[in-house]
Amino acid sequence: MAFSLRIGIRTTDSKRCLVLLVLVVLLTVLACLPPSVEGNFPVGKFRRCNNNKGICVSREQCLNGQINTVGHTQIEPRLLNDDDIDECDVYGMQCCNLPSTNVPADSDEEEQEEEEKEKKGGTVTTTTTEEPDDPDWSRQCGQRTDVTERADQDGETNRFEFPWSVALFSKAQFFGKVRKEFLCGGTLIDDYLVLTAARCVNQKDRNTLVVQLGRWNLDAGKESRMQEIAVEELIIHRGYVLSSHLHNVALLVLANGAQLGRAANRVCLPDHSVQFGPDTLCYVVGWSNSPSPNTSNRQLKLRSMVAPVQECTATIRRSTGAWDFRLLSENICTTYLDDTVPCERAPGSGFVCESPTLPGQYFLVGIASYAVRQCHKYRAHDVFVHVPDYIEWVDGHVVNQSRQTSFYRPDPISFD
């Protein structure tokens, strides 16, 4: 009897071990499976909400109702009221819509052409409808040719009005087809170099990044005179800090040189010797990260001025409840002169001001770094990286790339 009991116990233990082993194998297999992905955002580990149209995330990950895939805001979440708790039913969490691809799919022929070039090891450089060159376009930095097209709505640029403004995209494969997601704005300073915010490219694979020059309407697919160039190298400031946006600046080295002309030209960079008065009219130029429904995402220009530091600090403190907030010394704030401004502007967009001594010549004074506003609740100043504080950093990397620093300054020494 004792012998039979021992056998029974051993048999039971063996069954338990077998069950545990099967469970371990199943869990291992599940762990190796990739999470479901929509856009560039993994959704498998998040709770679904809004009839599967969104997921529950922390409030600082949700900008204007949509997942923020670029970066996070600097300011801690404000104190919440009972009314702020939604169907996620967790303090500090909210239902946020999943990101969508901002650019329509390219035609099958265009996709095949790009894929063939990449398979051959080449970089993608596309220029659509051929148009004659402009013999009178200025080879000076920061200058534009005469613009005759008129914008349909206030706040929209004319095509090629700011030819140094570029759009940065991330490419991904979806069901065997290439899709591009708009990430950020950027500014051309050399035919091989683009300045943008570090948050736009931090931890990004350079092989997935492309810039488009000569763009106007991001919803229009291909446009005449548009150039698309792959990114060959990312240079992120070594001191960049994600949480505080300290040194939020990066250089993109392009795989091929841009064809400069009416649709694509570089901006000037100012050092501290270039002084802009408090009443200098400037523009924030770029696209919206969250365009309004049933509207095209065309390039915008927002009339702006540099805001006093005290005023900027006060509005951000009031808006966020972060009463110990201090503006970084390498940052500036802008104030908008128009009553109607789009809710969300893309990081990396340029803040350009006209030269005080050379009318018609524009300098890149700031790079859009972050914003803390909630459009329907309050208005606060946007924060920009102050470009003159980074001229030495830019010059050093430009020299390392065997390029000339005079190219983004008035009266370039050489144009080769």
UniProtKB/Swiss-Prot annotation:
InterPro entries per UniProt: Peptidase_S1_PA, Peptidase_S1_PA_chymotrypsin, PPAF-2-like_Clip, Ser/Thr_Proteases_Immune/Dev, Trypsin_dom
Signal peptide span: 1-39
Domain named Peptidase S1: residues: 147-399
Subcellular location per the Swiss-Prot or TrEMBL entry: Secreted
Entries under CDD domains matching the protein: Tryp_SPc
Organism domain of life: Eukaryota
An example Gene Ontology CC term for this record: extracellular space
Span list, region Disordered: 100-155
Entry-linked Gene3D superfamilies: Trypsin-like serine proteases (2.40.10.10)
Start-end of Acidic residues biased regions: 106-116
Pfam families: CLIP_1, Trypsin
Domain Clip: 48-97
The protein's role, per its UniProt record: Probable inactive serine protease which plays an essential role in the innate immune response against bacteria and protozoa infection by activating the melanization cascade. Binds to the surface of parasite P.berghei ookinetes and bacterium E.coli where it promotes the accumulation of mature TEP1 which leads to the melanization of the microbe.
Record text on subunit structure and interactions: Interacts with mature TEP1 and to a lesser extent with full-length TEP1; the interaction is induced by microbial infection.
Domain notes: The clip domain consists of 35-55 residues which are 'knitted' together usually by 3 conserved disulfide bonds forming a clip-like compact structure.
Membership in a protein family: Belongs to the peptidase S1 family. CLIP subfamily.
Name the UniProt record assigns to this protein: Inactive CLIP domain-containing serine protease A30
Gene that this polypeptide is encoded by: SPCLIP1
